[in-house]
Amino acid sequence: MNKTAEELVESLRCASEGLTNALTSITVKVSFVFLATVILLSYYFAVLAIRALWNNNIFSNSTRLILIVCLLNSVVHQSTMMEIRIRQVYRSFVYSSEPCRLPFHFTDCEVELYFYYLTNYFSTYSVFSLTFDRLISYFFPKCYISYPYQVSISLLIIQLVFTLGTYYFGLYGVPKLGYVPICNYAPRLATNFVKINDFRTTIMVFCIIVTIFIYYLNVKSEKQIKRTSYSLGEQYLARENVATSQSVCILIVLQFVCISVSSFGVNYIKSIKSTLSDEEYNKIAPFVVGVTYANLCLPLVIYFKTKLTIRKRRIRIGVMTSVYGDVGEHINRLKKSWE
């Protein structure tokens, strides 16, 4: 078996003509510029999102901690992707006429693969933490309010366990053999990636369904509280739950759409690989990096949702103070109108 694997490695050491044409093509260079732009934008908005969570937080403390950890993970993932693509584009210029020096050996990519796939899976399973954060906030509100950090840390630990388990299933024990065009490609001897993509997709679909259900319950609860309660604290908490559930729902749907680019996209491309030339396949594949796109969507949603919510609050406060005077007077007017 080892001898066969070594022979396979030696036979694939040099890039084919199609692979050489792809790696040195304008298309792959354009993909580098495009992804570099996405990554730089994600850095910028990650800083803005972290500032918003720190200084103008509209989320619960539990949700905020989960989002901050996910943002930090996204920065590591984007940095890893940037380093991978810089190495690839460097080789495409320097070794454009040396096909045997264009591909990367598995050992050349070992560190990048470690960071790339761990942060990739951690980003995917953030939907689990955010979904169950919403579940706990609705069904166990007292516990959620009293122990916000214990809740978020517990969910992040479970998220990490999922991440490590998936990494172990996909890459642990895979022989350090084989060559790949770009270091984020799965090793040639790793065989479980289709199963992993199917599992990730199942988790995300489940989380979307649950989050939409929780959002519906929160909206229904807020309407009931508005009709029956004069407590501003209770009304504020209900409104916060609706806003948070809405944001989480948007995040999970965007994560699903982006990561589906990787999951379904990679599986589909592999299924039709026999109908594509080597050059065509390797021109398309560099664009299919859904988590990189998802890591731009995450800070965008956090930042703009925070700005929008703050703007709505200011407008609402302005209306209340200009039309009804102070809050006490407003409540008295409501009481009279309901008598």
From Swiss-Prot:
GO molecular function terms noted in the UniProt entry: G protein-coupled receptor activity
Sorted UniProt keywords: Membrane, Transmembrane, Transmembrane helix
Matching InterPro entries: 7TM_GPCR_serpentine_rcpt_Sra (IPR000344)
Gene Ontology annotations of biological process type: sensory perception of chemical stimulus
A Gene Ontology term for the protein's cellular component: membrane
Pfam families attached to this UniProt entry: 7TM_GPCR_Sra
Record membrane topology: Multi-pass membrane protein
Record field: transmembrane: 30-50, 113-132, 151-171, 199-219, 249-269, 284-304
Keyword Phosphoprotein: no
Keyword Transmembrane recorded: yes
Subcellular location: Membrane
Family: Belongs to the nematode receptor-like protein sra family.
Name used for this protein in its record: Serpentine receptor class alpha-20
